[in-house]
Amino acid sequence: MIYTMKKVHALWASVCLLLNLAPAPLNADSEEDEEHTIITDTELPPLKLMHSFCAFKADDGPCKAIMKRFFFNIFTRQCEEFIYGGCEGNQNRFESLEECKKMCTRDNANRIIKTTLQQEKPDFCFLEEDPGICRGYITRYFYNNQTKQCERFKYGGCLGNMNNFETLEECKNICEDGPNGFQVDNYGTQLNAVNNSLTPQSTKVPSLFEFHGPSWCLTPADRGLCRANENRFYYNSVIGKCRPFKYSGCGGNENNFTSKQECLRACKKGFIQRISKGGLIKTKRKRKKQRVKIAYEEIFVKNM
């Protein structure tokens, strides 16, 4: 009898011990879940696509082939592999990882193209007209690399690419060549607007102004896709000043600053060179009472 009672007590003691230990691993799982939530809640900067089709989901199509292809995943913001069936599908499908990155990642958009004339032009000027996937009817302008001119088109209101300008003048200043095949006169006009003074211009030989700043400073203001009404600043490359605009809260481009000072620091630093057959003039900007003046520091003139 005594042996049986001891056995029952031992059994109940074991049960109590197991119940006391059970919450420990449950709490551990909970903590792991909390840690995982903290990691995944990290906010990423707004996604900016080069082409609207980069936002499409991977589509293997109705056929049954097994072909390795790549697509741009807007959630991971990377090009990833998927299996394509061999027919139909959509444009977010590339034969190689390199082709996917070239068409859909932002690193490619910030490259600068140098031509044989040593002029500089943002790479997005060479993108094709893209109205986007929305159904708006907004008049915009794009640079047509076939005709070498800025032309009007109808923008849907969302996505699309960076070859998209609100005004014809803005498109011409950024993407079109000057009358002699140089992107000169446009940037020369910018300098005059920045300094509120006349800068000596050569009428005999062509010259070239190079903007040595971030390429996104040359992009137009982009309100974005959402419905907020936040006060922001963008750099207006036509007049050479930072101007306010209303930001919707998502989307848009990198020419977007929370303060005028931040805009000036990002887009007005550096220097501009003037190159011509007659010589090389290096200029640096000096600030004085909120005005910028050109100081000619070094002048190298060739003996004719």
UniProtKB/Swiss-Prot annotation:
Bridged cysteine pairs (disulfide): C54-C104, C63-C87, C79-C100, C125-C175, C134-C158, C150-C171, C217-C267, C226-C250, C242-C263
Q: Record's InterPro entries?
A: Kunitz_BPTI, Kunitz_BPTI_sf, Prtase_inh_Kunz-CS, TFPI-like, TFPI/VKTCI-like
Post-translational modifications reported in the UniProt record = O-glycosylated.
Q: Give any Pfam family that matches.
A: Kunitz_BPTI
Tissue expression profile of the protein: Mostly in endothelial cells.
State the source organism's domain of life. Eukaryota
Q: Would you tell me the protein name for this molecule?
A: Tissue factor pathway inhibitor
Name of the gene this protein is made from: TFPI
Organism, by scientific name, is Homo sapiens
SUPFAM superfamilies this protein is in?
BPTI-like (SSF57362)
User: What outcome follows a substitution of L117A?
Assistant: Results in resistant to ELANE- and CTSG-mediated cleavage
Q: Which GO terms describe its biological process?
A: blood coagulation; cellular response to steroid hormone stimulus; negative regulation of blood coagulation
